[in-house]
């Protein structure tokens, strides 16, 4: 009622307001007040919005009915105040009719008629009618309504205060019945609209307000007089809250008690008096218990034990790895091995299974040491992914030449083929690979007893892009097949032969003459002599040379190779008893880019180690294991003089004392000394780091 009778119009939601009676529905266009833009006024304490005018219309009839009059006559018997209506929608119409009946009962027929006559004969109405009669009847009615609003505002407020007392159900007055006509049934009455919160942030979704019991007016009131809030006088006990405070905003300071203490002597009688003072001072009267229960959007103060922030943001969603783009997941899965993808990741969900089946993971297949690999499996893999570029089937004994032929036929883009120790394969498989995969660049088929020169001839004639070959321990290969490869594959960069007794100096000469891009050459245990090795001096790009166990290799050939091959970085001369200290000294002086020198079981002494430490500034790895003439002096001097040494192999150098090695380990921690005891210690340390613990019970038993 307070906001309807105030001078400042209340901003209500844009909805059609119900008419108060049938007379208003006929005269509404003539009695509607003009809309005015409210002037900006400083914010005032928010008043409790307990209820609205039951007639819901700023018409002249509302002010006539609300005029002050004599108190209602006492009836034959008093009825107790009505209990608060239920909140259900089925009783909305009945609740509205009960409130309307109680407001009608507070007025007498004579009072309403007298009020109407007083207003119609008042000077304010006459002045308004005279001022607007010159324009039009519509403007006359409008001015009359404005005058009525100004004249009856204060009287309406007094009526509101008087209506808070006990009411009787006596029936509507005669004056009201005269204007209304037939009384509609309770079901036909319009349902009052919901109260709308007009504080700041009202449109933001908020939590359910916590309704605390209110014993006075202090819990819900925000105006000038709260009645019975906690002081002796009962007025203004709690400080006024700002009008834009949120409904459920937790207080920053300790909150005031929601209810006055039970021992307060003024908790019963003070509210009415204080409320009357507040109304006369321009404030708002305190609400009754029923009105407080019906006030849906009154300010509620949150309990400190259960704070509620109306502007709380929803909690962030739990991050899900499946929300990443597929390209990122594929990049992550690419770091997994084939076992981890097939046996772990692909079993998580269907999405991961599909990602694990992506074609890029099936370009490079490592099926080594898997006895489940059969011809049928190779056929299925080749049928599903025909873009395989690399496959490793080493130690797969359950397949045959047929599976390799199907794989080669369905994967013409194969670039790298590895099949170590597949003794069941023959020339048929290598011929199929050479025939269907012309882009082949790498062929490693070591330790295949059935491989002959026929397969090598097909490789040399059809695979012109071949760069890396490995035919170690293929005992049936001879110079015939090797020469065909040397003449047909001019882009060769790596060649490794091991224990191929049928390969002689002719093959070495052919590779040296036709393959100038060779960088890695290995003829370990082959029937090669110094006459064939000397041709390797033509290879200017040679960086790694493996001449282990070459029976007829002399020192002059080795020194000549080191002098001419300036890019040589690794030289392996193990198991050559003819290599002596003089050869090692030349190697240390001439090897400008040499970093690795392997001299296991050679005929050298401490002088070779001293020469390496004195003349070489690049050698980082030296292995002189099984050299019986190496002593503590050579190991100590090379460690002291060499600035680049990082590894010194002293395995089975029996003249080197272990105590000396322990001292060298402490003095030169940047150098790794390899002996039997030192290697055992490092192995145990790695085992401990990986979580291994010794079983003391088994050791004691």
Swiss-Prot record:
GO terms for biological process: nervous system development; neural crest cell differentiation; proteasome-mediated ubiquitin-dependent protein catabolic process; protein polyubiquitination; protein quality control for misfolded or incompletely synthesized proteins; protein ubiquitination; regulation of smoothened signaling pathway; SCF-dependent proteasomal ubiquitin-dependent protein catabolic process. Residues 252-264 have a biased composition (Pro residues). Keywords: Cytoplasm, Neurogenesis, Nucleus, Ubl conjugation pathway. It is found in: Cytoplasm; Nucleus. Residues 1-20, 72-94, 227-300 are annotated as: Disordered. Residues 227-237 have a biased composition (Gly residues). It comes from the Eukaryota. Residues 1-11 have a biased composition (Basic and acidic residues). Its main location: cytoplasm. One of its GO terms (cellular component) is cytoplasm. InterPro entries: F-box-like_dom_sf, F-box_dom, F-box_LRR-repeat, Leu-rich_rpt, Leu-rich_rpt_Cys-con_subtyp, LRR_dom_sf. Substrate-recognition component of the SCF(FBXL17) E3 ubiquitin ligase complex, a key component of a quality control pathway required to ensure functional dimerization of BTB domain-containing proteins (dimerization quality control, DQC). FBXL17 specifically recognizes and binds a conserved degron of non-consecutive residues present at the interface of BTB dimers of aberrant composition: aberrant BTB dimer are then ubiquitinated by the SCF(FBXL17) complex and degraded by the proteasome. Part of the SCF (SKP1-CUL1-F-box) E3 ubiquitin-protein ligase complex SCF(FBXL17) composed of CUL1, SKP1, RBX1 and FBXL17. Interacts with BTB domain-containing proteins such as KLHL12, BCL6 and BACH1; specifically recognizes and binds a conserved degron of non-consecutive residues present at the interface of BTB dimers of aberrant composition. Interacts with SUFU. Interacts with PRMT1. This is F-box/LRR-repeat protein 17. The lineage of its organism: Eukaryota, Metazoa, Chordata, Craniata, Vertebrata.
């Amino acid at each position: 009622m307070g906001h309807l009778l105030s001078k400042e119009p209340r901003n209500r939601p844009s909805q059609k307001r119900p008419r108060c009676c049938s007379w208003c529905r006929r005269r509404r266009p003539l009695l509607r007040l003009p809309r005015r833009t409210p002037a900006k006024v400083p914010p005032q304490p928010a008043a409790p919005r307990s209820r609205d005018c039951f007639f819901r219309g700023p018409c002249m009839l509302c002010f006539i009915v609300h005029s002050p009059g004599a108190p209602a006559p006492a009836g034959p018997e008093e009825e107790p105040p009505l209990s608060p209506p239920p909140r259900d929608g089925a009783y909305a119409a009945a609740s509205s009719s009960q409130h309307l009946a109680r407001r009608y009962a507070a007025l007498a027929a004579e009072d309403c008629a007298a009020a109407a006559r007083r207003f119609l004969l008042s000077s304010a109405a006459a002045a308004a009618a005279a001022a607007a009669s010159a324009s039009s009847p519509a403007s006359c009615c409008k001015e009359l309504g404005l005058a009525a609003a100004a004249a009856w505002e204060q009287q309406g407020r007094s009526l509101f205060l008087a209506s808070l007392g006990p009411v009787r159900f006596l029936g509507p007055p005669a004056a009201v019945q005269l204007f209304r006509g037939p009384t509609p049934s309770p079901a036909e009455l319009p349902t009052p609209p919901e109260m709308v919160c007009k504080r700041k942030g009202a449109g933001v979704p908020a939590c359910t307000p916590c309704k605390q019991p209110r014993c006075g007016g202090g819990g819900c009131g925000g105006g000038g007089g709260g009645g019975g809030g906690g002081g002796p006088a009962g007025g203004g006990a709690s400080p006024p809250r700002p009008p834009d405070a949120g409904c459920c905003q937790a207080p920053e300071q300790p909150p005031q008690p929601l209810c006055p203490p039970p021992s307060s002597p003024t908790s019963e009688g003070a509210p009415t008096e204080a409320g009357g003072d507040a109304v006369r001072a321009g404030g708002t009267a305190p609400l009754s218990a029923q009105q407080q229960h019906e006030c849906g959007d009154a300010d509620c103060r949150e309990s400190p034990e259960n704070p509620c922030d109306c502007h709380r943001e929803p909690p962030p969603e739990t991050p899900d790895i499946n929300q990443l783009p597929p390209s990122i997941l594929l990049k992550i899965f690419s770091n997994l091995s084939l076992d981890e993808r097939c046996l772990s990741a692909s079993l998580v969900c269907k999405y991961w299974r599909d990602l694990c089946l992506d074609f890029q993971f099936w370009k490079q297949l490592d099926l080594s040491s898997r006895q489940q690999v059969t011809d049928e499996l190779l056929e299925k893999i080749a049928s599903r992914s025909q873009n395989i570029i690399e496959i490793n089937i080493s130690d797969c004994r359950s397949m045959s030449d047929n599976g390799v032929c199907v794989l080669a036929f369905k994967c013409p883009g194969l670039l790298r083929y590895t099949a170590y120790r597949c003794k069941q394969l023959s020339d048929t498989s290598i011929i199929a690979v050479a025939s269907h995969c012309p882009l082949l660049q790498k062929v490693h088929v070591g330790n295949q007893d059935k491989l002959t020169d026929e397969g090598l001839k097909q490789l040399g004639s059809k695979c012109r892009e071949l760069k890396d070959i490995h035919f170690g321990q293929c005992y049936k290969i001879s110079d015939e097949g090797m020469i065909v490869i040397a003449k047909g594959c001019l882009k060769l960069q790596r060649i490794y032969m091991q224990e191929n007794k049928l390969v002689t100096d002719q093959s070495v000469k052919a590779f040296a003459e036709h393959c100038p891009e060779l960088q890695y050459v290995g003829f370990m245990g082959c029937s090669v002599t110094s006459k064939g090795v000397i041709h390797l001096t033509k290879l200017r790009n040679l960086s790694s040379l493996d001449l282990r166990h070459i029976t007829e290799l002399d020192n002059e050939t080795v020194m000549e190779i080191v002098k001419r091959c300036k890019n040589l970085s690794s030289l392996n001369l193990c198991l050559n008893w003819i290599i002596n200290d003089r050869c090692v000294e030349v190697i240390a002086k001439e090897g400008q880019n040499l970093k690795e020198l392997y001299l296991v079981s050679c005929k050298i002494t401490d002088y070779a180690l001293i020469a390496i430490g004195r003349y070489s500034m690049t050698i980082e790895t030296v292995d002189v294991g099984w050299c019986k003439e190496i002593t503590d002096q050579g190991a100590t001097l090379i460690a002291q003089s060499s600035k680049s040494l990082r590894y010194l192999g002293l395995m089975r150098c029996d003249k080197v004392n272990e105590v000396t090695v322990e001292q060298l380990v402490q003095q030169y921690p940047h150098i790794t000394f390899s002996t039997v005891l030192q290697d055992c210690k490092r192995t145990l340390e790695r085992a401990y780091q990986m979580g291994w613990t010794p079983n003391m019970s088994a050791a004691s038993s």
